[in-house]
């Protein structure tokens, strides 16, 4: 890692040296020409020197805030942050771009990248909190609603299914945890919540109904360990017979799902 950092530093210094040398030889950029200034500012971006690109493009934005190239400079800054895995900064930059330029030709791309930035931060493991996955889903849903005809919207729809599946599996993981701890009120509640929020995943819904039925059967027999916790007593008003009826109801729902 240290070796790579040294190599990167050498490349940065070399790039700066070459830029300065070039500046001495070439004709200076006309300060009244935003197009020429932008072309010069984006050179580091084209050469994948993203840290320098952020600086140069930021200076261009400050100098020519009303230029037609200013929005493109904003996108390139966000792209640079994303390329450097600075996802929180990238998400903020892309979000700001959409807010300022909702009708720009790059707006759909920027909205897609807001979601992608959060997605890059989200853990793959379903036993970990999925806050970033939920944020990505929310941003892609905005994209599909605001820019339904865009190519990015089509990509987002595929990723939305993947994201929702991950969150559903995380919900299943939590429900399983409660069942293993014999906390059956919370177990049944979590499984039924999964069936309501993610009905499109038939395999998960079938398992959820099956496990909810088992949890209700345990509750009917008074075997839950969460009876002393008011926050977890979701079905305390139900009699033993009503709990058994619930168990039978959800066994039937599970059996009705054909995979």
Question: Positions of the model-derived regions?
Answer:
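Bacterial N-terminal signal peptides
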Residues: 11-19
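Bacterial N-terminal signal peptides that target proteins for export
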Residues: 1-12
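Acidic, polar-rich low-complexity tracts and alpha-helical solenoid repeat scaffolds
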Residues: 2-3, 21-259
């Amino acid at each position: 890692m240290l070796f790579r950092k040294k190599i990167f530093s050498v490349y940065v210094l070399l790039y700066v040296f070459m830029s300065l040398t070039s500046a001495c030889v070439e004709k200076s950029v006309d300060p009244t020409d935003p197009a020429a200034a932008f072309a010069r500012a984006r050179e580091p971006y084209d050469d994948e020197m993203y840290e320098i690109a952020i600086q140069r493009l930021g200076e261009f934005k400050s100098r020519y805030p009303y230029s037609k190239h200013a929005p493109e400079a904003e996108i390139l800054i966000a792209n640079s942050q994303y390329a450097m895995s600075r996802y929180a900064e990238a998400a903020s930059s892309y979000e700001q771009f959409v807010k300022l330029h909702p009708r720009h030709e790059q707006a759909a791309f920027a909205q897609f990248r807001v979601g992608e930035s959060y997605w890059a931060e989200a853990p793959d493991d379903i036993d970990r909190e999925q806050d970033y996955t939920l944020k990505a889903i929310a941003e892609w849903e905005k994209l599909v609603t605001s820019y339904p005809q865009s190519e990015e919207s089509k990509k987002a729809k595929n990723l939305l299914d993947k994201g929702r599946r991950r969150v559903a599996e995380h919900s299943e993981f939590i429900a399983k945890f409660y069942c293993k701890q014999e906390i059956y009120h919370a177990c049944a509640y979590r499984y039924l919540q999964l069936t309501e929020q993610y009905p499109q995943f038939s395999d998960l819904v079938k398992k959820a109904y099956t496990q909810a039925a088992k949890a209700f059967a345990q509750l009917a027999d008074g075997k839950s360990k969460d009876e002393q916790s008011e926050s977890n007593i979701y079905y305390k008003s139900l009699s033993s017979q009503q709990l058994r009826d619930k168990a039978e109801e959800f066994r039937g729902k599970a059996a009705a799902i054909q995979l």
